[in-house]
Amino acid sequence: TSQPDAFPVDAWVDAEPIPTAWGSLSLVLATRRLFEKAWQDGCTSMLLLSGDMLPLQSFQVIERSCRQTQMSLQPCTGLNDRQRRANDQRYSTIAPWFGLAKAALRKQNMFFAMSSADYALLRDLDPSDFPLKKLADEYFWVNGLISRGRFVSPRRFVYCNFDPTCTQAASFNLDEALLEHCCQGGYIFVRK
């Protein structure tokens, strides 16, 4: 909304927010607008989170970790046939746009941290003509960085599913055992 009831002092409220929908290209466009504002404000890194994510580390650890780009990536192995076919179709669609071979492409979780230096590499990419209209948020950022020669290694940024090949959040009980598993695994956030 362009007129929230309450917001922190010195917060920026977009007067004309981009309407977004789950899995839509609009999420990439809205994220880019947020990142551009952060860039203009001199931020050294940007962190994209969701309201259903909980921190697993102290603020100091989160702040230090998020100074560099952090993405949870889908592994290349262990995918089921449906996942392989879906990625193959999407990679075929976006590979020419990025100028990359299909084998170089990756899928990410939509929530991530990005350094301003890495974002600078992507500022000339115009997501409005990105050929993937559905689930663009899981393919645009990571592959944009790869297309700019940036190696993106998988990080344990957000825990969202017992199955490491799935990038969407699963329903689970947030109990002590799960929290301990996430913390020991080095995750920064858990998404429920």
Which ranges hold each PLM region?
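ER/Golgi luminal nucleotide-sugar-dependent glycosyltransferases, focusing on the catalytic module
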Residues: 1-192
